[in-house]
Amino acid sequence: MKNMKNILLIMVSFIGLELAAQQDPQYSMYMFNGLAINPAYAGSAEGINANVLYRSQWPGIDGAPNTIVANVHRAFMDEKIGAGLSFNNDQIGVMDRNTISLAGAYHLKFKYSKLAFGLQANYSQYNIGLSRVQHSQDNSADPTFAANLSESTINFGAGVFYYADKFYAGLSVPAILNNDLSATEITGGQQALEVPQFLYNAGYIWAADPMIDIKPSILIRHTSGAPINFDLNVNAYYKKFIGLGVGYRSSNALVAMLECQVHPYVKLGYAYDRELTDLGVFARHTHEVLLRFTMGPKGAQISPRLY
C-alpha cells in the first residue's frame, strides 16, 4: 500500500512535466520581450538590449508555476546581423526546466522597414526533485524519494519578423522538434512531448496626438491537438514615458499593465493577470515584473522603444 501511494505521488509530479513539455510558458508582457518568442527579433532594436522577467502564477499555492527569463541581444555588421542569448527557468511542483538558447538573425533593409529571418538552438535540462516531495507525516526516509532525476534535450527554433517605426508582425516556432521524453527516467512511463508551438504576433502604434500613442497588439498561439489561444492588448503611452494597458487572454484571463521609462536606458513593467475561471481565491492571480535595459554607444541618444 505504501509503495502504491509513492507511485501515485510520483505520477502526480509528472503531470507538471507533461503540461510544461507540451506548451511553452506564456508571458503577459510579450510585446516588450520579443526575443522570448521569436529569434528573428535579435538585433531589431538600437544598441544592446537586455531583459529580465519574473512571472509568479497563483501565489499562495504550493508548487504553482514560476518563470524567470533573462536575455540579451544586439545588432552587428551595420545592423544586418543580430545575435541573442536567452536563459529560461520554469518551475511547477517538483519539476523545473532550464533552457539556454542562442539566436541569430539576418535583417533585410527596405526604404521604411526591415525584414528579419532568425534561427535559434535550445538546450533544455529537465529536473524532478523527488527529495522535495512530502511523502509522509514524519518525513521518514524512503529510497523511492532519495534521488533527483534529470534529462536533457536539444531543439531548434525559427522565425520571421517584419518591423517599421509604427508596425511590426512576426511568425515563429521557438522549438521545432517533437522530442519524446516518454521513455526517459523522469517521466515514469507517462507521455511527455515537446510539441512545436506556432506563434503569430503583430502590433501597430497610432499617434493619437503629439504626446499620446496608442498601441493595439495581438499574440496567437497554436499547438497541434490543442485549442488556439490568443492575447489581445491595448496600451496607451504618455510622452513615451509612462504607459497603461489592458488585455484579454482567450484562456479566460484579464490583464492590466503598467510601464515606466524611469531612465532613457531603463524601463520597468508590471502586469497583473486575473483568472476568470473558478480556481479558488489564490489561483486567480498572477504577477509579472519586467526590467529592460537599452545601452547604446557612449554619447548616443536612443529613442524609447514601444515594442
Give residue spans per PLM region.
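Sec-dependent N-terminal signal peptides
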Residues: 4-16
